[in-house]
């Protein structure tokens, strides 16, 4: 069963700018369970009277055939500001952004064991730059965290050009 993962963090002006203070993973309980709605309620219940910003996977805009609302609709309905791209960034760009941010710009609370384990154990398929998702317990937190980091701290790609002489 694929969990829905959320990494809760705050951004500061001074270094380290990102401080991850909680991670939540929820799985379907069955029936007509709306996992995104449960996540919204879980976060707002644990941290009331806060400003909520979500950085979801771009596929969250789509509604299933039986769904009345998309995941992004549910986040907005729950009072979250949503920052989502029209398409997901390339995995390598997300990974590069996270790796750059991990170089002294992030503090992760030790209780965020799922994110820490993901960061330590997620690797590429041998001989490729593609993330190995064969272990179903891994990559959920790194994916969630990666969308946030990519949006707020993107890596800037150099542009190459030619000089006319």
Map each language-model feature to its residues.
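Short, conserved catalytic/metal-binding motifs centered on acidic residues
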Residues: 6, 54-56, 144
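Active-site-proximal flexible loops/turns
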Residues: 5, 64, 150
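Generic structural signal for hydrophobic core residues of well-folded globular domains
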Residues: 10, 123, 148-152
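Acidic, Mg2+-coordinating catalytic module of metal-dependent nucleases/exonucleases
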Residues: 133-157, 164
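Catalytic-loop motifs flanking and including active-site residues across diverse enzymes
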Residues: 2, 35, 71, 140-144
